[in-house]
């Protein structure tokens, strides 16, 4: 979240708390009127303040047989602030939250049924198989980072002649978002160790100490890198990824380089972790499975084209060396929705 969107989101939260009518405002979008009926109205928002864009779509509820919404980021400590906005969700048949710890307080703010929908990844694009490019990048530290860990890795990389990749500019836009994701996948498929910490690990003033699983875990495992970092202290983390999927270290870890050198003494374990992560992404965390959860909530099923993608994902998973039939996903149990067929 950049500073402008941060200020906008906070301002709307405060206004909606004291002025309920804010929830009926159109923030400036061109008004659209649905002129025919649809089977499903699907809305995906990053923040609760984005819900105001619904006011720019006339007759969306009357014209759509079912309606499902996804809210990526809503922290439990913020639910009371957005009660005015939450009433916009009452018309949905189901609401999915990307923060599992927020389900209980949200259920008290909205009458809409709600459940957890974890982040996902384009597992087919990120999969390193069958090509298996050489992992020439020693460490990839993407996005928010600990200055302590970063300084330690810089010195370690200089001393040992390792390749340490990290962000050097603060960019909020991309020339081409599809090319950006393609390049990210290419980097991770060539990375040995990928740093992943609990979502917004360094912004406790936003999370109020709530620990959630962020996108980095899904991207890193899908690309076959070994995850290193601070996982969220939540009971469902292992149900999402399985045991021994990452090397837990403090978010602030000045001697991480030495830890990585010690891990390299057991290449067999690292290879098992890599293949477990890739297999897990292909069978549990591709966006196909998230979309299937959305459709299930609406009483709908996947298209034949989506089923073809499922077959391709299973075919890639078979290349990891473990029979697909022996890998049973308990993701849907963690998400509190039925397991996909």
Residue ranges and their predicted role:
Residues 257-261, 265-341:
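C-terminal amphipathic helix plus adjacent low-complexity
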Residues 215, 251, 285:
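Residue-level signal for the nucleotide or nucleotide-sugar donor/cofactor binding architecture
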Residues 60-74:
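Active-site proximal beta-strand in glycosyltransferases
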Residues 173-176, 209, 245, 266, ...:
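Generic anion/oxyanion-binding catalytic loop in active/binding sites
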Residues 61, 136-138, 245:
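Residues that mark the start of a beta-strand
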Residues 73, 119-122, 251-254:
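Short, acidic/turn-prone active-site loops that include or flank metal/cofactor-
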């Amino acid at each position: 979240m950049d500073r402008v969107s941060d200020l906008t989101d906070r301002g709307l939260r405060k206004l909606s708390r004291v002025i309920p009518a804010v929830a009926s405002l159109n923030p400036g979008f061109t008004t659209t009127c649905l002129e025919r009926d649809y089977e499903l109205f699907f809305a995906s928002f990053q923040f609760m303040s984005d819900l105001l864009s619904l006011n720019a779509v006339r007759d969306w509820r009357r014209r759509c047989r079912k309606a499902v919404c996804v809210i990526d980021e809503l922290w439990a400590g913020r639910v009371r602030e957005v009660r005015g906005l939450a009433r916009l969700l009452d018309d949905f048949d189901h609401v999915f939250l990307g923060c599992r710890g927020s389900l209980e307080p949200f259920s008290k703010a909205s009458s809409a049924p709600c459940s957890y929908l974890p982040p996902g990844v384009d597992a087919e694009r990120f999969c390193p198989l069958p090509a298996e490019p050489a992992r020439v990048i020693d460490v990839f530290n993407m996005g928010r980072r600990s200055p302590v860990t970063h300084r330690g890795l810089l010195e370690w990389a200089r001393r040992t002649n390792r390749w340490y990749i990290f962000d050097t500019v603060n960019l909020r836009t991309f020339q081409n978002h599809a090319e950006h994701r393609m390049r990210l996948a290419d980097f991770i498929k060539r990375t040995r160790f990928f740093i992943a910490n609990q979502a917004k690990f360094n912004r406790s003033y936003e999370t109020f100490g709530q620990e959630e699983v962020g996108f980095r875990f899904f991207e890193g495992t899908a690309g076959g890198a070994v995850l290193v970092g601070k996982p969220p202290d939540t009971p469902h983390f292992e149900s999402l990824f399985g045991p021994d999927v990452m090397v837990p270290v403090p978010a602030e870890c000045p001697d991480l380089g030495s830890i990585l050198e010690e891990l390299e003494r057991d290449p067999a374990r690292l290879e098992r972790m890599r293949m477990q992560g890739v297999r897990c992404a292909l069978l549990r965390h591709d966006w196909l499975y998230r979309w299937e959860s959305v459709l299930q909530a609406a009483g709908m099923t996947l298209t034949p084209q989506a089923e073809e993608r499922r077959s391709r994902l299973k075919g890639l998973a078979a290349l990891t060396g473990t029979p697909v039939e022996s890998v049973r996903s308990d993701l849907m149990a963690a998400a509190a929705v039925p397991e996909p067929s």
